[in-house]
Amino acid sequence: MSSGQSSSSSGKAGPQEPPSSAAEPAYRSPGLRGVRTTSLFRAVNPELFIRPNKPVMALGLLALSVCVGYLGYLHAIRDSDQQLYEAVDSDGETYMRRRTSRWD
């Protein structure tokens, strides 16, 4: 009977707490917010520790999209603009003429 009493007195039969209850808060804060770092590292890399601001990210994505669209527009205008040039004929009149290659 002493073996039965020793097993119940050791606490194995009842509910047990997990041994790493102190490490549990590290799992609750995802990312680098829960990691212990120096204040210098946090000052140099603040974007790793602050919560993302979704309206600011949406505004930045919109601005980047507008810039890329404008660059595409300028590229299209430049290509169509290079195909024509102003030529002067023997009478002195000017007209627009399509560029031709000397190799054709």
UniProtKB/Swiss-Prot annotation:
Does the record carry Ion transport as a key word? no
Q: Where does the record place Low complexity bias?
A: 1-11
| Its membrane topology | Single-pass membrane protein
Q: Which InterPro entries match?
A: UPF0708
Q: Where in the cell is it found?
A: Membrane
Q: Where is the region Disordered?
A: 1-31
UniProt keyword annotations, A-Z:
Membrane, Transmembrane, Transmembrane helix
The UniProt family comment states: Belongs to the SMIM8 family.
Q: What is this protein called?
A: Small integral membrane protein 8
- In its UniProt entry, the species of origin is given as Danio rerio (Zebrafish)
Instruction: Please name the gene that encodes this protein.
Output: smim8
